[in-house]
From Swiss-Prot:
Annotated protein name in UniProt: Outer membrane lipoprotein SlyB
Residues linked to a lipid group, S-diacylglycerol cysteine type: C18
InterPro entries the record matches: Bact_OM_lipoprot/Surf_antigen, Gly_zipper_2TM_dom
Parts forming coiled coils: none
Induction: Induced by low extracellular levels of magnesium via the PhoQ/PhoP two-component regulatory system.
Cited Pfam families: Rick_17kDa_Anti
Lipidation (N-palmitoyl cysteine): C18
UniProt keyword list: Cell outer membrane, Lipoprotein, Membrane, Palmitate, Signal
Amino acid sequence: MIKRVLVVSMVGLSLVGCVNNDTLSGDVYTASEAKQVQNVSYGTIVNVRPVQIQGGDDSNVIGAIGGAVLGGFLGNTVGGGTGRSLATAAGAVAGGVAGQGVQSAMNKTQGVELEIRKDDGNTIMVVQKQGNTRFSPGQRVVLASNGSQVTVSPR
Protein backbone atom coordinates (compact mmCIF):
# COMPACT_ATOMS: atom_id res chain seq x y z
CA MET A 1 0.00 0.00 0.00
CA ILE A 2 2.79 2.43 0.89
CA LYS A 3 4.56 1.69 -2.40
CA ARG A 4 1.40 2.50 -4.37
CA VAL A 5 0.92 5.85 -2.62
CA LEU A 6 4.58 6.76 -3.10
CA VAL A 7 4.47 5.86 -6.80
CA VAL A 8 1.29 7.92 -7.36
CA SER A 9 2.82 10.84 -5.44
CA MET A 10 6.04 10.73 -7.47
CA VAL A 11 4.10 10.61 -10.75
CA GLY A 12 2.03 13.61 -9.66
CA LEU A 13 5.09 15.61 -8.67
CA SER A 14 6.79 14.70 -11.95
CA LEU A 15 3.83 15.99 -13.96
CA VAL A 16 3.85 19.28 -12.05
CA GLY A 17 7.39 19.81 -13.34
CA CYS A 18 6.11 19.67 -16.93
CA VAL A 19 4.53 23.13 -16.70
CA ASN A 20 5.76 25.38 -19.53
CA ASN A 21 6.57 28.90 -18.33
CA ASP A 22 8.55 29.73 -21.48
CA THR A 23 5.55 31.58 -22.96
CA LEU A 24 6.41 34.44 -20.59
CA SER A 25 9.65 35.02 -22.50
CA GLY A 26 10.11 37.32 -25.47
CA ASP A 27 11.82 34.40 -27.24
CA VAL A 28 8.73 32.13 -27.36
CA TYR A 29 5.36 32.51 -29.07
CA THR A 30 2.29 30.39 -28.34
CA ALA A 31 0.55 28.52 -31.16
CA SER A 32 -2.32 31.03 -31.09
CA GLU A 33 0.15 33.92 -31.56
CA ALA A 34 1.68 32.39 -34.69
CA LYS A 35 0.53 33.83 -38.02
CA GLN A 36 -1.22 36.74 -36.27
CA VAL A 37 -0.81 40.36 -37.30
CA GLN A 38 0.94 42.41 -34.63
CA ASN A 39 1.60 46.12 -34.42
CA VAL A 40 5.30 46.95 -34.34
CA SER A 41 7.00 49.92 -32.74
CA TYR A 42 10.61 50.69 -31.88
CA GLY A 43 12.38 52.07 -28.85
CA THR A 44 15.46 52.20 -26.67
CA ILE A 45 16.00 50.47 -23.32
CA VAL A 46 16.30 53.04 -20.52
CA ASN A 47 16.59 50.70 -17.54
CA VAL A 48 16.70 46.95 -16.88
CA ARG A 49 15.81 45.39 -13.54
CA PRO A 50 15.69 41.69 -12.62
CA VAL A 51 12.37 40.58 -11.09
CA GLN A 52 10.61 37.38 -10.10
CA ILE A 53 7.38 36.44 -11.84
CA GLN A 54 4.96 34.53 -9.61
CA GLY A 55 2.85 32.27 -11.82
CA GLY A 56 -0.51 30.89 -10.88
CA ASP A 57 -2.71 32.05 -8.06
CA ASP A 58 -1.80 32.10 -4.36
CA SER A 59 -5.23 30.62 -3.59
CA ASN A 60 -4.47 27.58 -5.78
CA VAL A 61 -4.67 24.68 -3.34
CA ILE A 62 -3.53 21.71 -5.43
CA GLY A 63 -0.12 21.58 -3.73
CA ALA A 64 -1.70 21.94 -0.29
CA ILE A 65 -4.23 19.18 -0.93
CA GLY A 66 -1.60 16.81 -2.35
CA GLY A 67 0.71 17.50 0.58
CA ALA A 68 -2.09 17.05 3.11
CA VAL A 69 -3.13 13.70 1.63
CA LEU A 70 0.44 12.41 1.58
CA GLY A 71 1.19 13.81 5.06
CA GLY A 72 -2.00 12.34 6.49
CA PHE A 73 -1.22 8.96 4.99
CA LEU A 74 2.31 8.96 6.36
CA GLY A 75 1.07 10.14 9.77
CA ASN A 76 -1.47 7.31 9.80
CA THR A 77 1.34 4.75 9.63
CA VAL A 78 2.68 5.95 13.01
CA GLY A 79 1.47 4.52 16.33
CA GLY A 80 -1.95 3.15 17.16
CA GLY A 81 -5.25 4.30 18.70
CA THR A 82 -5.37 7.96 19.72
CA GLY A 83 -1.70 8.44 18.84
CA ARG A 84 -2.39 7.34 15.29
CA SER A 85 -5.26 9.84 14.97
CA LEU A 86 -3.09 12.67 16.27
CA ALA A 87 -0.21 11.67 13.98
CA THR A 88 -2.60 11.56 11.00
CA ALA A 89 -3.93 15.05 11.76
CA ALA A 90 -0.45 16.48 12.36
CA GLY A 91 0.86 14.84 9.20
CA ALA A 92 -2.01 16.26 7.15
CA VAL A 93 -1.46 19.80 8.45
CA ALA A 94 2.32 19.67 8.00
CA GLY A 95 1.96 18.07 4.57
CA GLY A 96 -0.52 20.74 3.48
CA VAL A 97 1.80 23.56 4.50
CA ALA A 98 4.79 21.88 2.84
CA GLY A 99 2.82 21.12 -0.33
CA GLN A 100 1.68 24.71 -0.69
CA GLY A 101 5.25 25.94 -0.18
CA VAL A 102 6.59 23.57 -2.84
CA GLN A 103 3.87 24.65 -5.29
CA SER A 104 4.60 28.33 -4.66
CA ALA A 105 8.33 27.81 -5.25
CA MET A 106 7.68 25.90 -8.49
CA ASN A 107 5.49 28.72 -9.84
CA LYS A 108 8.28 31.34 -9.65
CA THR A 109 10.44 32.23 -12.63
CA GLN A 110 13.16 34.81 -13.25
CA GLY A 111 11.99 37.82 -15.21
CA VAL A 112 13.19 41.20 -16.36
CA GLU A 113 11.48 44.58 -16.07
CA LEU A 114 12.27 46.73 -19.10
CA GLU A 115 11.77 50.49 -19.09
CA ILE A 116 11.60 51.53 -22.74
CA ARG A 117 11.47 54.98 -24.34
CA LYS A 118 9.56 54.50 -27.57
CA ASP A 119 10.52 56.46 -30.66
CA ASP A 120 7.23 58.40 -30.36
CA GLY A 121 8.45 59.82 -27.01
CA ASN A 122 6.27 57.70 -24.70
CA THR A 123 7.94 55.63 -21.98
CA ILE A 124 6.54 52.19 -21.15
CA MET A 125 7.38 49.36 -18.75
CA VAL A 126 7.26 45.70 -19.84
CA VAL A 127 7.88 42.64 -17.65
CA GLN A 128 8.73 39.36 -19.34
CA LYS A 129 10.60 36.16 -18.54
CA GLN A 130 14.37 36.39 -18.82
CA GLY A 131 14.98 34.31 -21.94
CA ASN A 132 18.18 33.81 -23.92
CA THR A 133 18.25 37.49 -24.87
CA ARG A 134 20.06 39.82 -22.46
CA PHE A 135 18.97 43.46 -22.50
CA SER A 136 21.02 46.50 -21.51
CA PRO A 137 20.37 50.26 -21.27
CA GLY A 138 20.83 52.02 -24.61
CA GLN A 139 19.97 48.90 -26.60
CA ARG A 140 17.52 49.32 -29.50
CA VAL A 141 14.46 47.05 -29.33
CA VAL A 142 11.37 46.18 -31.32
CA LEU A 143 7.99 45.90 -29.57
CA ALA A 144 5.37 43.59 -31.09
CA SER A 145 1.86 44.10 -29.70
CA ASN A 146 -1.39 42.28 -30.35
CA GLY A 147 -3.39 44.81 -28.36
CA SER A 148 -3.19 43.10 -24.97
CA GLN A 149 0.33 41.66 -24.86
CA VAL A 150 3.70 43.13 -25.82
CA THR A 151 6.82 41.17 -26.71
CA VAL A 152 10.19 42.94 -26.58
CA SER A 153 13.01 41.69 -28.81
CA PRO A 154 16.40 43.10 -29.79
CA ARG A 155 16.45 45.13 -33.00
